[in-house]
Regions:
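Intrinsically disordered, glycine/charged-rich N-terminal periplasmic/extracytoplasmic linker segments
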Residues: 70-78, 82, 96-105, 110-111, ...
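A mature extracytoplasmic/lumenal domain signature
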Residues: 81, 116-118, 146-149, 212, ...
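A broadly structural signal marking compact, well-ordered functional cores
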Residues: 16-22, 196, 206-214, 220, ...
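Short beta-strand edge/turn micro-motifs at domain boundaries
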Residues: 124-158, 245, 265-290
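A compositionally biased, intrinsically disordered/low-complexity signal enriched
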Residues: 40, 50, 69, 102, ...
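Core segments of small alpha/beta cavity-forming domains
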Residues: 31-86, 162-221
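Surface-exposed, charged secondary-structure patches
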Residues: 86-123, 220-258
């Protein structure tokens, strides 16, 4: 991000929001692929409408909120856009959903993890958000907007060969792989590398082994300890054939040599593949602004 956008500053400074899991068997995300996709499309349209703003036509923003928002999300949007609406300078902010994956879907309620890109006057920035939406009278309305979210995963379905069980096994595997890949300690660089190497396979494993000395030295020189934040979030973008692509978000907790801790939002895509009873990463693609 070259320069912080007014709205993005508000988005990334919002409080992390927690949520609740749904009962086992209640999560139809990717199980009912057609309705999951339709719900994600509806949430995408609603999010892009209410998170864009043109100071030359403020009434359009109010109309978008009235049509697409309910419950707590109304107050959340008021807070997020308070400074933007008071700006003495013209604002033309366009928000697009870059990626989105369903965390849970129950037919009349959907929660998704989305990467937003905001553009204004040639500058751009990213934010990762968890949206909750409710179907009301045949229309999906946003009911909660959690920026830099840390929310518990839905209760997992048994790994019994069903689509839901495969999905949740892949997500658990992706979270475990992410914990090993993105957790490092400069006082134990060799151990940090070994933990990462143990959770990768295929081309990624070849790359790690070829660059082992470089990785170990980079960890040692960093002078930091990095850990995942609480309740890291993972949602499947695709699933099939013992493979999955997972959208993963956490706020990394980075501790420097003086003991100071800084939170760094981090979003990435992980390709994972089933390897016996475990899942291993075959590719990692950090999500950055276009």
């Amino acid at each position: 991000m070259r320069r912080a956008l007014p709205a993005l500053v508000l988005l990334t400074s919002a409080c992390t929001v927690t949520g609740t899991a749904v009962p086992v068997g209640g999560n139809l995300a990717l199980v009912d692929a057609g309705r999951t996709s339709a719900a994600l499309d509806a949430v995408k349209a609603a999010a892009e409408a209410v998170l864009s703003y043109d100071s030359g036509n403020p009434g359009a923003f109010d109309q978008a909120v009235a049509a697409n928002v309910t419950g707590a999300a109304k107050d959340q949007l008021t807070q997020l856009f308070d400074q933007v609406r008071k700006s003495p300078q013209p604002v033309h902010l366009v928000t697009r959903v870059r990626q989105a994956a369903a965390l849970e879907f129950t037919g009349d309620r959907v929660r998704d993890l989305a990467v937003l890109q905001q553009d204004s006057s040639g500058t751009n920035g990213l934010a990762t958000v968890a949206f909750t939406a409710l179907r009301d009278g045949g229309r999906w309305r946003l009911s909660d907007i959690a920026v830099n979210p840390a929310q518990p995963a839905p209760a997992p379905q048994p790994d019994d060969g069903s689509t839901g069980g495969l999905r949740d096994a892949a997500l658990a595997g992706a979270r475990a792989a992410a914990g090993a890949l993105f957790t490092t300690d400069s006082s134990d660089p060799a151990g940090s590398y070994a933990r990462a190497e143990a959770v990768v396979t295929g081309p990624l494993l070849d790359d790690y082994r070829a660059k082992k000395a470089t990785y170990v030295e980079a960890i040692r020189k960093s002078g930091t300890k990095v850990a995942l934040g609480p309740d890291p979030m993972a949602a499947a973008l695709s699933l099939g054939g013992g493979r999955a692509t997972v959208l993963f978000f956490t706020t990394l907790q980075v501790t420097d040599a003086a003991g100071r801790v800084t939170g760094r939002p981090f979003t990435t895509e992980l390709d994972v593949v089933r390897a016996g009873s475990t899942w291993k990463a075959t590719a990692v693609r950090p999500v950055t602004a276009a």
